[in-house]
Amino acid sequence: MIVVNANLLVQYYVRGTHTAVAEAVLSRDAQWIAPMLWRSEFRNALILLVRRRLVPLEDAVVVAHEAERLMAGHEHIVVAHRVLRLAADSGCSAYDCEYVALAEDLDVPLVTSDRQVVRAFPSVALTPERFLAA
């Protein structure tokens, strides 16, 4: 079981230079979990791609449904005080710290391409490449 952030989900579902790595992460550990926040972040990333004309709106809707199916039953609520403490101590956003808090609470790795999170939380956050090499 691993915590994944919305960026990794976007990399998995939207074909691009990082898709193969995201697919390898899923092959290595298919039990992906995330805080409930992932949905909003994922949708926001998709609409940004739509606005840049990189993904048609219809495709974004399909991708959103596919991601929701993958993550169904694997979404967790994290408590505010943990998230806020992590954000205050690290300088990372509260959004990012939702993923960190979940990973720490469940004692599982957080796989993310967010270098700031990896630097701030080296004991729990791994890049996809480092996760695959471990």
Predicted segments, located by residue:
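Acidic, PIN/NYN-like endoribonuclease modules and their adjacent C-terminal/linker elements
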Residues: M1, C92, V100-A134
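Active-site neighborhoods of divalent-metal-dependent phosphate/nucleic-acid chemistry enzymes
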Residues: R69-S113
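Active-site-proximal, substrate-binding regions of enzyme catalytic domains
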Residues: R43-M71, R82
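Active-site phosphate/pyrophosphate-handling residues
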Residues: N7, E41, E98-A101, Q116
